[in-house]
């Protein structure tokens, strides 16, 4: 299996974010399946979701994510689904968060705050391999972290 580290800005990940029963959950310009079939449908609670947003605005490193690159050039989230959904749903205005002492949704952020969020670089390992290799890697990273 081939695994390469990439830096991808949040702006790229949240592009064309969709979360619907019909179309599933996708982002990255429609090229990223955020909730593939092997992923659970668990969504972070408010505390965990807010910790993701705090991490971004504090400029701290967010845990690495793993994506699978498919033969057709699309991607699937192998690990990092809840973090990705938290970022996308905040950008979509689906919840508010305390930033700089004030409760703010995406629409209430200053241009500087929006730029900081969108320019944040995520560390993403992109994996290519057979379905068996990908499933084995999924099991390993979900046990070993």
For every predicted segment, state its role:
Residues 3-16, 36-145:
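Basic- and aromatic-enriched surface patches that contact anionic nucleotides/nucleic acids
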Residues 13-25:
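C-terminal active-site-capping segments
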Residues 22-27, 107-111:
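Membrane-targeting and insertion segments and their boundary/processing signals
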